[in-house]
Amino acid sequence: MQVAVIHTAFEDTPRTVAFVDVPEEISAFGTTDECLEYAYRWTNNIMGSWSRNDIEDNGDYNPNVTVMAPLNEGGMGLRSTSMGDQMLIGNKKYEVAMCGFEEV
């Protein structure tokens, strides 16, 4: 299963920043929320930069994440996915809520 991550919370226009390929052991046996949680985790900057693969010891790099947006000026990585951003699975759109996800 693939999840499209769309940053909308702080942008003037929505911007697709990543496609996240959810591993089969999660997508085949898990819930939709577990797939969304996987995409959320791996598009957050916790121990490095999720959007950069050129950093040594980058705990946030995941080869299952395809970055779709250009990096920020100066090569700075993209921001973390936040409340108000959206995720798309197939034709269903979800918004990152204060706690979990809400279908929109």
Region spans (language model):
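Short alpha-helix capping/helix-loop boundary micro-motifs
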Residues: 64-77
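Short, compact, well-ordered microdomains
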Residues: 76-104
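Feature targets compositionally biased, intrinsically disordered low-complexity regions
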Residues: 29, 47, 58, 73-76, ...
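N-terminal non-globular leader segments, chiefly Sec-dependent signal peptides
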Residues: 1-64
